[in-house]
UniProtKB/Swiss-Prot annotation:
It is found in: Cytoplasm. Keywords: ATP-binding, Cytoplasm, Kinase, Nucleotide-binding, Phosphoprotein, Serine/threonine-protein kinase, Transferase, Wnt signaling pathway. This is Casein kinase I isoform gamma-1. Residues 1-34, 351-388 are annotated as: Disordered. GO terms for cellular component: cytosol. Its EC number is 2.7.11.1. CDD domains: STKc_CK1_gamma. It comes from the Eukaryota. The modification Phosphoserine is found at S344. Serine/threonine-protein kinase. Casein kinases are operationally defined by their preferential utilization of acidic proteins such as caseins as substrates. It can phosphorylate a large number of proteins. Participates in Wnt signaling. Phosphorylates CLSPN. Regulates fast synaptic transmission mediated by glutamate.
Amino acid sequence: MDHSNREKDDRQRTTKTMAQRNTHCSRPSGTSTSSGVLMVGPNFRVGKKIGCGNFGELRLGKNLYTNEYVAIKLEPIKSRAPQLHLEYRFYKQLGSAGEGLPQVYYFGPCGKYNAMVLELLGPSLEDLFDLCDRTFTLKTVLMIAIQLLSRMEYVHSKNLIYRDVKPENFLIGRQGNKKEHVIHIIDFGLAKEYVDPETKKHIPYREHKSLTGTARYMSINTHLGKEQSRRDDLEALGHMFMYFLRGSLPWQGLKADTLKERYQKIGDTKRNTPIEALCENFPEEMATYLRYVRRLDFFEKPDYEYLRTLFTDLFERKGYTFDYAYDWVGRPIPTPVGSVHVDSGASAITRESHTHRDRPSQQQPLRNQTTSSERRGEWEIQPSRQTNTSYLTSHLAADRHGGSVQVVSSTNGELNVDDPTGAHSNAPITAHAEVEVVEEAKCCCFFKRKRKKTAQRHK
């Protein structure tokens, strides 16, 4: 009898020990550890919120096995216009061979949400544009342009069109990283296959399409309701290049009673602005670029090498060296805590996917162009550089630590007191109001800017 009881006690102790080991070593997706840490998959600890939008939110995360920071994009599983899985599929379609694409580490459920874990990158071109007093030199614009032509060529080679060109979607690498000089392309929530995967044929030309993209940069044909193709991505890039050189575009700041009227005015002004006037006082190559891409046929494959050569020849003729000495090099660049930039005043729109806050059919007050403080994400200070407090003071992270963050290696989910991923890591994920699905299950820009009051920053 005693022997039987001892065996029973031993089995109970063994079962309890195994359960404790399993609890420690194997965490289901989207569960919390005993210390209340929210996990995505077995590796990724969810940290503070660094962005949000109609379809979910962005969190800072950390890979507990490599000690590296990541970005975690969350979307409610029951979203009426889900796009995260489609974006993940596009990232996989693009693969990891192309330069200037963020690595995607994981996709899976996180409680009532789908989660995509991405490489954490540096600030966007819009942030850097602000840092450089909203004008880039010709050398910097040419180094950006040559790289982005290659990025877009690669995206197109994978049978995708991007459809959301804007400075907020192009990021440099993180400071101190070997890829810090590389311009990355992110956020494929509006991308579309322009080659039918079954027939292998180019999608047909159509008209009366809804606006998809960012009004400030989108092509003239997009304003006219024409189906987008490769030519439209390149025209939008050309508009962005001129934005960087000029500091603004002639169709910015137009007033109208409704958003629909405003988008109409933007399109009309683009059509009525001669390329020569848009590119006045800048090298002829800028006008040549825009003339070429605007003359492309809907089905035509652009000559990317011709366009790159246009800019590389100009670069060499000016005596520049491709040394990645951008205008922002040497300036106090804050260290970003998010790799997916939040929306600016030039918000992306799509009417073929859902009813959006910027949809022209909605009668709502127009937003004024956002200030630079609204455009920026949340930042940490990089103390190794001489900081300009007048620039940085109003742009610090809500959970700043007054200096570099010291991270202790951890694989057990325990939080170091100085770890930014520990801040509000188990805070509830707030789902935003659902939107009406109109046509395709795609979203427009994933993140909205959130203004943070000074008092909130110091909480």
